[in-house]
């Protein structure tokens, strides 16, 4: 997760991500939250986290895949794992926000059934787009 923060270090508003990474596990603690780490023989190559929101909603946070591993199915595997786990926890839908310049991430979310929604968090950066996956 720290690699993601450093990769986007020049992005306005990145400070909240750095603070979040420094207080792990924070809101991602079980039983309603979780963190997954993808590893190769060389170490960590990706991560994703789940945290609870009010009303039976789970939030996907800190999705990151190392540049060298993008386009190889790592992000999809992480998200599919998170989605399956969220279902077992009883969440009825998932939400997430992603920066508008992350076209590959938006494409991945759409391929897994996430649809665009209105802004649900006021504290996210201005150029954040929001998505939701409903389990009903």
Predicted segments, located by residue:
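Acetyl-CoA-dependent GNAT
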Residues: 1-61, 66-67, 79-81, 85, ...
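Active-site acidic-Proline motif in GNAT/NAT acetyltransferases
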Residues: 66-72, 100-101
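Short polybasic/polar patches that bind polyanions
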Residues: 70, 87, 110
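Conserved G/P- and acidic residue-centered "switch" motifs that form tight phosphate/ATP-binding loops
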Residues: 73-75, 90
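Alpha-helical macromolecular-interaction surfaces
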Residues: 77, 81, 103-104
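C-terminal "cap" of GNAT-fold acetyltransferases
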Residues: 92-112, 118-136
């Amino acid at each position: 997760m720290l690699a993601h923060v450093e990769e986007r270090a020049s992005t306005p508003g990145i400070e909240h991500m750095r603070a979040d990474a420094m207080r792990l596990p924070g809101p991602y603690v079980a039983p309603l939250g979780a963190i997954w780490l993808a590893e190769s023989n060389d170490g960590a190559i990706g991560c994703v986290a789940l945290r609870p929101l009010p009303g039976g909603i789970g939030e996907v946070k800190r999705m990151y895949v190392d540049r060298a591993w993008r386009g190889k199915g790592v992000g999809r595997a992480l998200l599919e794992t998170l989605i399956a786990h969220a279902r077992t926890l009883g969440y009825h839908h998932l939400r997430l926000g992603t920066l508008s310049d992350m076209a590959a991430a938006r494409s991945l979310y759409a391929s897994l059934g996430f649809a665009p929604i209105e802004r649900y968090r006021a504290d996210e950066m201005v150029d954040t787009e929001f998505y939701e996956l409903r389990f009903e």
